[in-house]
Amino acid sequence: MESYIQNLFAERIGGKKFGKEDVIYKFEKIKRAKQEAMKRHPDMELIDMGVGEPDEMADPEVIRVLCEEAKKWENRGYADNGIQELKDAVPPYMEKVYGVKDIDPVNEVIHSIGSKPALAYITSAFINPGDVCLMTVPGYPVTATHTKWYGGEVYNLPLLEENDFLPDLESIPEDIKKRAKILYLNYPNNPTGAQATKKFYKEVVDFAFENEVIVVQDAAYGALVYDGKPLSFLSVKDAKEVGVEIHSFSKAFNMTGWRLAFLVGNELIIKAFATVKDNFDSGQFIPIQKAGIYCLQHPEITERVRQKYERRLRKMVKILNEVGFKARMPGGTFYLYVKSPTKANGIEFKTAEDFSQYLIKEKLISTVPWDDAGHYLRLAACFVAKDENGNPTTEEKYEDMVLEEFKRRLEGMDLEFE
């Protein structure tokens, strides 16, 4: 007999059909394919370039600060909307790394338990039924999901190679612009690796004023750039009048599981965010915030991380070009974004997802496919390399061993592209 609870689920998560849908989503397919492939080839190591998670632990000094602060009686309690010391550390960091000045640490900065809830809370603060959120695709879906949950609509802006993977704001219909409230951006961009330009950000500011929308720029990979200095949306004149930027510690400081981020920018948006946040969480553990302060005071940690990814990405580009792909260095992030072949070894593939499944099952190479705006594969440079004892390591000779095997498996596939 079916439980009455099955009839009580909210429509936003599927209503009465919750848990009964037989649709298997992309990442679940990847997970299942990896498990199947490893069973079929028990003596073959999986090369996982799909996971977008740093392969290293946080810097030893950051861990030391966490441990020391966790022992202090005064750090045991609720943090609510964050400790002021963390907020005070943000303006010097933004000026040193991004050249952004005049940030008010009291009213223009707030912390978040990672960037995912930050995106959810902002949506909660602004979206009513019928409102529109402008979303770039492919991309991180959290803002879109929550927009729909609140009865809003999502208007997708495809990121195309011919436009340097920047959205075409002029293509948005007038009726959509009239109902739009949020423009979500993510640069450096996941998955394309594209970096925005000052010219583009100026266009965004003008667009926001003209159409009265707020800008949410997700800078999760902000400092991981390979062509020039990191660029903040807030470095553009009047950007602070229309939006906020979200900075995560996950990618820049190898702290994915620590769950720490901060928002910086428009005072009204920060105030609304704080109101929503007050009703959802009680703040991140204070010792983690203290460790975050150390990070912001030591941006050279990110520079070491960035150098490792640049080294790996350049090697991956070389290998991919040698075996038949057309790869180039990204502007930022730790991803390569390459066109997916339509044929390999005489086998035809209609989508990037089809080819990605083939790579996992036949070559034990995991990637993430994207078919939202063309057919592409995302390959991450945060793959795990192991030493002779099977322990994770970042020594270059061991990452070279992974990449040599990566190349060996890809060679001779007779790739064809449209």
UniProtKB/Swiss-Prot annotation:
Domain of life: Archaea
Localization: Cytoplasm
Cysteines paired by S-S bonds: none
Temperature dependence: Optimum temperature is 70 degrees Celsius. No activity is detected at temperatures below 45 degrees Celsius. At 85 degrees Celsius, the activity is 85% of the maximum activity.
Catalytic reaction list: (2S,6S)-2,6-diaminopimelate + 2-oxoglutarate = (S)-2,3,4,5-tetrahydrodipicolinate + L-glutamate + H2O + H(+)
Any single biological process term in GO: lysine biosynthetic process via diaminopimelate, diaminopimelate-aminotransferase pathway
Main location: cytoplasm
Co-factor(s): pyridoxal 5'-phosphate
GO terms under cellular component: cytoplasm
Family: Belongs to the class-I pyridoxal-phosphate-dependent aminotransferase family.
Role description: Involved in the synthesis of meso-diaminopimelate (m-DAP or DL-DAP), required for both lysine and peptidoglycan biosynthesis. Catalyzes the direct conversion of tetrahydrodipicolinate to LL-diaminopimelate, a reaction that requires three enzymes in E.coli.
The protein's name: LL-diaminopimelate aminotransferase
Origin organism lineage: Archaea, Methanobacteriati, Methanobacteriota, Methanomada group, Methanococci
